[in-house]
Amino acid sequence: MKFLTVAAAIFASTSLAVPTNNHNGGGACVPRPNPGNSNTSSAPGGNPTGGHTSSGPGTKPTGSHTSSGPATKPTDGNTSSGPGTKPTDGNTSSGIDCEVPRHAPTSGDDFKGICAAVGKQPLCCVIPVAGQDLLCQDITGGNSPSGQPTSVPGGQSTSVPGGNPTSIPGGQPTSVPGGQPTSVPGGHPTSAPTGHPTSVPGGQPTSVPGGNPTSVPGHHNPSPVGNDPSCCPSGLYSNPQCCAANVLGLADLDCSTPSQTFTTGDEFRNICATIGRQPMCCVLPVAGQAVLCEKPVGV
């Protein structure tokens, strides 16, 4: 009997030591939170429910968010580095998998929208070749590529083909074929093949066939010196080359500069023929390969 009395007393004392309410607000024994679910109260009156963290008196959060201060909102894990920012691929010299916009954009915003529709970004490039454009850069703001001007520090307005004049700091307006006259600082207007005059600083106008005469500073209309400019007119296709092969009309392989100057198209052809090549006018001769070439005028 005495043994049973002692055992009953031990049993009763053990039962009283185990809390029966995990949410009594003052207990020190807290259940292990389920994975992804945490109930923590750090001040009197806290009564967390579900997966919450409470850090102030009288708080009673509901749902599954964490409160860290007034008017805070949970985030979805996305990060932003500033208004209007977007990720980039870090490629500043060439665009990969490029294509011409489906239709001519009327503004910078329209350009962006056209490219965004196919999951791409707008770029201004030099030479599109087989899906890869060489030497690309971001478009300038939201201005129209064929209307509104953009300028560099101290310069005049800037535009792409068919748009407004472009200049370098302190210079006169500059344009590509079909645009307005172009010049270097202090010089006369310069243009690509459209008959507009071209000059160097202080010189007289220079033009392609059918335009005005050509000169250098301090001289008046001297005879042409060097290669015949009528074969490869100034502009995009202005580099005379002797090339061995042509690929799809876009790239000429194994090209080299003519070994001597020529004054006629026939001389240009004969110089190239002596090394088994054909005369071409190219845009960008690079390491023996000229990209985008065409046949010389009158050859």
Curated annotation (Swiss-Prot):
It is found in: Secreted; Secreted, Cell wall; Vacuole; Cytoplasmic vesicle. Residues 1-17 form the signal peptide. Glycans are attached at residues 39, 78, 91. PROSITE patterns: PROKAR_LIPOPROTEIN (PS51257). Its main location: secreted. The keyword Plastid does not apply. The keyword Calcium does not apply. GO terms for cellular component: extracellular region. Disruption phenotype: Compromises aerial conidiation and submerged blastospore production. Does not affect radial growth and multiple stress responses. CDD domains: hydrophobin_II. PANTHER family: HYDROPHOBIN (PTHR42341:SF1). Belongs to the cerato-ulmin hydrophobin family. This is Class II hydrophobin C. It comes from Beauveria bassiana (strain ARSEF 2860) (White muscardine disease fungus). The lineage of its organism: Eukaryota, Fungi, Dikarya, Ascomycota, Pezizomycotina.
